[in-house]
Amino acid sequence: MTTIPSSATSATKTLGGTELARGIRAEVTSAAAELTLLGVTPRLAVVVATDDESSAWYVRSIARAAAKSGLLCDIVDLGADATTQSIRAELQRLSADPAVHGIILQTPLPAGANFEDLAASIAPDKDVDGANPLSLGRLAAGLPAYAPATAAAVLALLDHHEVPLAGRTGVVVGRSNVVGKPAAQLLLQRDATVTVCHRYTQNLGHHTRTADVLVVAVGRPGLITAQHVAEHTVVIDVGTNPTDDGGLVGDVDETSVSGRVAGLTPVPGGVGPVTTALLLQHTIQSASRSEPS
């Protein structure tokens, strides 16, 4: 593991997620095999109501990862013209199915469909991506709940690379229910002092330069540059923005900040693989409650 020093450094450490994700998947594979021997086959269901190709690619990657680890993964494609009623009915059906242990509602959704409203139909004990408002409320209250997997991946990466949090300053850029807000809550639970920045924040760099840990999750490529960071900062780049040549870039200008921060997650190969691994881990945790006594 890599320890990030608390003092300034001229070398930026790469905080990769591939090794961590591999370890989580190995644990998932072992647990899935044990559950299967006990008559419980872990099953994840992903509800899709879009023809967006990037979304389809992501869902297929989850299905492949699940299969490699011994989980079943059902892709429930309702079509891009699915109604709110049909999506809600499917989520309710899956929530009531004892053979299903994890449910994900994939975005984007058809026009007029409200994600939070629909996610409320996911049974909290199967809400492996922390989408149900009840799950988010329990997370904010410090009660047991599945955190959104991407937000959980941020904390898992920080722990894996032994980045201290208690008493440190955390700055989160972005306030979505998927990453920004839950990441801030998780940092608070680890005794960090947290600031959340958003589109109306004045003088963004004034806030981000104070960060010991900077989490960026807004979907704007190159938003964070050298002027926004300090040498002691550890930067977690959650952005995954497609490029014209088929690649991915983050919300952080890697060229600009490299050598100017203590640590930086790569895109791809940082938060992404850990997110997928944690979705499978959450599904295993849910399935374990179905284990025959």
UniProtKB/Swiss-Prot annotation:
A molecular function (GO) term: methenyltetrahydrofolate cyclohydrolase activity
Binding site for NADP(+): G174, R175, S176, T240
Gene Ontology CC, one term: cytosol
Pfam families: THF_DHG_CYH (PF00763), THF_DHG_CYH_C (PF02882)
Pathway(s) where this gene product acts: One-carbon metabolism; tetrahydrofolate interconversion
Keywords, alphabetical: Amino-acid biosynthesis, Histidine biosynthesis, Hydrolase, Methionine biosynthesis, Multifunctional enzyme, NADP, One-carbon metabolism, Oxidoreductase, Purine biosynthesis
Catalysed conversion reaction: (6R)-5,10-methylene-5,6,7,8-tetrahydrofolate + NADP(+) = (6R)-5,10-methenyltetrahydrofolate + NADPH; (6R)-5,10-methenyltetrahydrofolate + H2O = (6R)-10-formyltetrahydrofolate + H(+)
Record-linked CDD domains: NAD_bind_m-THF_DH_Cyclohyd
InterPro entries, sorted: Aminoacid_DH-like_N_sf (IPR046346), NAD(P)-bd_dom_sf (IPR036291), THF_DH/CycHdrlase (IPR000672), THF_DH/CycHdrlase_cat_dom (IPR020630), THF_DH/CycHdrlase_NAD-bd_dom (IPR020631)
Annotated coiled-coil segments of the chain: none
EC number(s) from the headed UniProt entry: 1.5.1.5, 3.5.4.9
BP GO terms, sorted: L-histidine biosynthetic process; methionine biosynthetic process; purine nucleotide biosynthetic process; tetrahydrofolate interconversion
Family affiliation: Belongs to the tetrahydrofolate dehydrogenase/cyclohydrolase family.
Assembly, per entry: Homodimer.
Function noted in UniProt: Catalyzes the oxidation of 5,10-methylenetetrahydrofolate to 5,10-methenyltetrahydrofolate and then the hydrolysis of 5,10-methenyltetrahydrofolate to 10-formyltetrahydrofolate.
The protein's name in its UniProt record: Bifunctional protein FolD 1
Species per Swiss-Prot/TrEMBL record: Saccharopolyspora erythraea (strain ATCC 11635 / DSM 40517 / JCM 4748 / NBRC 13426 / NCIMB 8594 / NRRL 2338)
